[in-house]
Amino acid sequence: AVTQFKGNPVLLNLWASWCPPCRREMPVMQAAQQQHDEVHFVFANQAETSDVIQHYLQTENLQLDHVLLDTHTELAQWVQSRGLPTTLFIDAEGNMQSYRMGELSAASLASHLQALQSSQSEIAH
């Protein structure tokens, strides 16, 4: 899924609507997504149905780009995530720059995104 975004940095967020920290960080993620056009935000829901996801997004008035269904939690297994939310920061070359398990505050997310973009500008020079 992430390979289609190669050439741009990617934030990959593993989440579920039943997860309180995931729910709290979603408005923060949406705001960051709107502020960072150069980063592709990908939201991989873990083991919920599309109906549940759509209902949650509509109820919370969230407009997220690239919401994926990971019905068998394959991504969580691949990154060996022990909890949700889990966020991966992937550079334009497809390499994971950092990994964070747990809720991200706006300040922490901004710091991770700045580091991701710094690695991007180093690649460009």
Model-derived features: positions:
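A short beta-strand-turn-helix
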Residues: A1-V10
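Nucleotide phosphate-binding site architecture
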Residues: T3, P20, Q30, Q97
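Aromatic-flanked redox-active Cys/Sec active sites in thiol-based oxidoreductases
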Residues: N13-W18
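Short, conserved active-site loop motifs that form the nucleotide-linked donor/cofactor pocket
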Residues: V39, D65-H66
